[in-house]
Amino acid sequence: MEKRILDKFRMGYFILYRNQGGLFSKGIIAKQLKAGFSKANAVYTHIEVSGGENHSVNISPPISKMIEIDKAHKGRYIRVMRYRNKDYEDGKRYKVAYFSAVLCNKGYDVKGILSFVFKWFKQNNRLYFCSEGAAWALQMEYPNALKGMKPEECMPAHFTDPYEFEEVWEGEL
């Protein structure tokens, strides 16, 4: 990956991944569209918190882990977003990245993602799915971020809200 692109992946920034056509992704898109998100934003079905340069925390089955973005997601279309807050750039983003890293090596909340798509599934509150983990990490520093919603109610498209997030870069890895 080119150095100029890697420079966009600062610690604590959020990386949104466009749908690749999987069964769960289609369910997430439908849920986000039903929640009122535009099609342009609803197609982002996965999110990770950047650890800086080519690293991020990937919360996906079977366990969350630190990955190398350029290897794990090569060829995927992404948007890099940052939280709109002066303190965020002055250092708070490092704490968000730290809180996200705390979630590494935890199991993935399969029941949580199923409850996200099908309301009759019960969620495990000790485990996380991708947008829930990103929201939790952000709200550890900014409790009112994402309009104060509970992390388990958060969807990847919530990180596209132009009032709370600013796009840093968009394109294919």
Residue ranges, per PLM feature:
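Short, surface-exposed secondary-structure edge patches
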Residues: 1-8, 39-41
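Loop/turn positions that initiate beta-strands
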Residues: 9-13
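Glycine-rich catalytic cores of cysteine/serine-nucleophile enzymes that process amide/ester linkages
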Residues: 14-87, 113-122
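Hydrophobic/aromatic-lined pockets within catalytic cores
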Residues: 20, 52, 104, 138-146
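A structural motif
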Residues: 70, 77, 89-113
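Activation targets extended, charge/polar-rich intrinsically disordered C-terminal tails
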Residues: 113-173
